[in-house]
């Protein structure tokens, strides 16, 4: 342990010099609007009528939106809009969460239901759908598309009624109100809210995740924007052509039937709906490092710290929906918001049109996962294939297919697997670990008796520190050897059974080799030669 702490302190000092330069508040990216040539490739879509505050009440849009220093809709404008809709529609209920942001801002959300259901008493045999936006505060089409959906539902009562025959919907339009206020990606404390889903460093993350776990949705969406002007090619004169990038949850500990439902039904329909709206799309990607001259793009990964996968590990269909918007201020905002609205409407309509298949597949997947004795996946890899990706030449706005290497996660390939334990045993000295699991919606039983008997233990054979300081820690790659031993644990120890719906979140958090495990993030610090203090029951 001494070596770990010493290295951590050294890394803290070094990290202060190599980390991104952040201040308290207003960590805003530079604005680089599209040239007239590029802008011509993203024209307004004829017939667009968006029912959200930035478009129905343009006088409420702050001046800073035009130069990239503010979003288009202040908290009070958003709340007033939501309250008015709720007063006019009996099936819309306005709520304020019983928690606040790091700077004390409110979290308003809407609950949509044709019955008298609630989060605590959901409708029987209906889909539960969670929709969130505004996770990153400088991605305004995310929360605006959520507000546009609410306005669209209110303006189309027959469509709303058809949806609510089959589902109850919770809409949390603004996940990060402090970030929106400062028009920055991060929380007020400069943690990335979309990288905190396993380590749970911030109370705000825990509060929202507890609300999510209580609602226990079948379907969820996470609305974001991506950087518009990221350039590629030898001359840096090509950019992504897409209006929309999207991805389902990819972690291999999500039931395969649920993952296939996401890919084969929802993703295919979404692509068609985006094209039908006169927009362009591709799978969500990030740029990778490559030893070849060809551009390497990585499909959305499997890491559980990302909201898309963390939500999916509760065994539900999840989509990350991104629109083209970071760094261009108010440019093309109608088209951007429309892109988000088209994606979320596609998900809702697909679920209703295929209700029996969707509901039964997810419910069967939950039962199959809960009762499974299959091995769990600790690490995986992304096979690389050749394909093309839609690009735009910034010189003449030509649209073309650009050849790339593509690291695919549809599906990823398992590398390290381990037998699924019947349960985990956690000593009473680790109540903070149990609390984190409970935030995930994982149940833990406190034993009134001491446990004496055989367990599987993990002996740490290697700990490798990352080269970068990341959100308060130096992450580690841990290797272990599984051994059997007898143990005596005192009364008050915790038993975490794995025959429960959200157990996959326990797998990724408690198995040390996982990239986002508690051991990786130093929540449970270990050194080479240690025995990991969480035990497995066969």
Swiss-Prot record:
List of glycosylated residues: 46, 393, 459
Gene Ontology biological process terms from the UniProt entry: proteolysis
InterPro entries xrefs: Peptidase_M14
Active-site residues, record numbering mapped to chain: 322
GO cellular component terms, A-Z: extracellular region
Keywords per UniProt: Carboxypeptidase, Glycoprotein, Hydrolase, Protease, Secreted, Signal, Virulence
General function of this protein: Extracellular metalloprotease that contributes to pathogenicity.
UniProt family annotation: Belongs to the peptidase M14 family.
Protein name, per record: Carboxypeptidase 2
Organism: Trichophyton equinum
